[in-house]
Amino acid sequence: MRMIAGSAFMDKNTPSYASITPEQAYANTKELIDRWNNKGRLNYAVTPRSAYLLSEAEIAVATRLVKEYPNIHVQTHLAENIESVNMVQKMFPGKGDYLDVYNYYGLVTKHSTFAHSIWIDDKDFELLAKKNASVVFCPTSNLFLGSGLFNIGLANKYHTKVALGTDYAAGTTLSIPQTMNEAYKVTQLRKAFAKNPDDVKPLDPFENYYIATLGGARALDLDQYIGSFLPGKEADFIVLNLQSTPILALRESRSKPLKDTLFAIEIVADDRAIEHTYIMGEKLK
């Protein structure tokens, strides 16, 4: 299956067993890029763990690698919680806010994806859109950790690319339908706490499916290969059984428009609904 992956590196505010020097980070990452990038369906992502876990020398490693490999993917964290935002400002004085630090080091590009991106503002979303970079909405992780509520409405205002993510480290599921369920709840909570609730729109089922499929593919610059059923694309998909559980069958039986059926899947479907899995058109399950 299609995959973009990378080995994270960090050297500040981290246990000694997880810390590596800038020299090690460069050598290790370069070796992995040369070994795995553009090999079959695999691509590599330069992965500076998070700005508050990086010295200036360590983050400069990512800059160097991006210059050496102009089309390489970059993945990192952005403004996941208030504490990390404050730490970045203290560690990189004079370089602006969290996103400004990444931009200063040349890491905001059309190949960059920024996980979480909760505590950012209009200026940041505008810059992300201008650079054609992407953010990854990780609702189960954000709710589990109490990090905050992602503002998909603000992302849409500036046409910033958004992908739906599970965040396996702190997320509570790898199931896409269940992750979509939590994404919907995040927008509902934003509405509850908003100064002007009428300005916050619920996450429409069509948009939810979009960020989980084609939107995610576009965020990763892979939409020429995956994300939809257009002829010529790679056929990676699942087949769902809408009668797999009594509650899903009941909910679906009362769904008339397509939007209702899609909403039923994202709210009450779970892994039991997966009937078949196809990779490159070959049935695996």
In which residue ranges do the predicted regions lie?
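His/Asp/Glu-enriched, well-ordered alpha-helical/loop segment
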Residues: 104-107, 111, 153-249
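C-terminal cap of metal-dependent C-N hydrolases
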Residues: 234-285
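A conserved active-site cap/scaffold subdomain adjacent to cofactor or substrate pockets
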Residues: 122-123, 129-166
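Glycine-enriched alpha-helix->loop->beta-strand junction motifs that scaffold or abut catalytic
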Residues: 2, 66-71, 107-110, 127-136, ...
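Metal-coordinating catalytic core of metallo-dependent amide/deamination hydrolases
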Residues: 1-117
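Active-site environment of divalent metal-dependent phosphoester hydrolases
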Residues: 53-54, 80-83, 119-125, 143-147, ...
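Conserved, mostly hydrophobic/aromatic
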Residues: 46, 77, 128, 135, ...
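Conserved short loop/turn motifs at secondary-structure junctions
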Residues: 47-52, 143, 197-198, 225
